[in-house]
């Protein structure tokens, strides 16, 4: 017989909060200046024309315009904002 009860329940029961990463404004959508376009961990997608990069690698619009995604140099994905 075991001399202690099962202690598994104290070792379980943790779960991290969701981080809500991903694209927030799809390609072709109209955005205002300051709108978050996508949240990411690391620079998987790079900011292009009229797009800024936050300190947590969030890409946001610098001007009012239309969001476009394309492959930039060295086949890296890039987000551009075209003025409308």
Swiss-Prot record:
PROSITE patterns: RIBOSOMAL_L27 (PS00831)
Alphabetized UniProt keyword annotations: Ribonucleoprotein, Ribosomal protein
GO BP term (any one): translation
Residues that span the membrane, as ranges: none
Region (Disordered): 1-21
Recorded family membership: Belongs to the bacterial ribosomal protein bL27 family.
PANTHER family linked: LARGE RIBOSOMAL SUBUNIT PROTEIN BL27M, RIBOSOMAL PROTEIN L27
Full protein name: Large ribosomal subunit protein bL27
């Amino acid at each position: 017989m075991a001399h202690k009860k099962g202690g598994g329940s104290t070792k379980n029961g943790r779960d991290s909060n969701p981080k809500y990463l991903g694209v927030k404004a799809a390609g072709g959508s109209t955005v205002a200046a300051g709108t978050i376009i996508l949240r990411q961990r690391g620079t998987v997608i790079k900011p292009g024309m009229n797009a800024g990069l936050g300190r947590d690698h969030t890409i946001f619009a610098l001007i009012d315009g239309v969001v476009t995604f394309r492959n930039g140099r060295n086949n890296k994905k890039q987000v551009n904002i075209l003025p409308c």
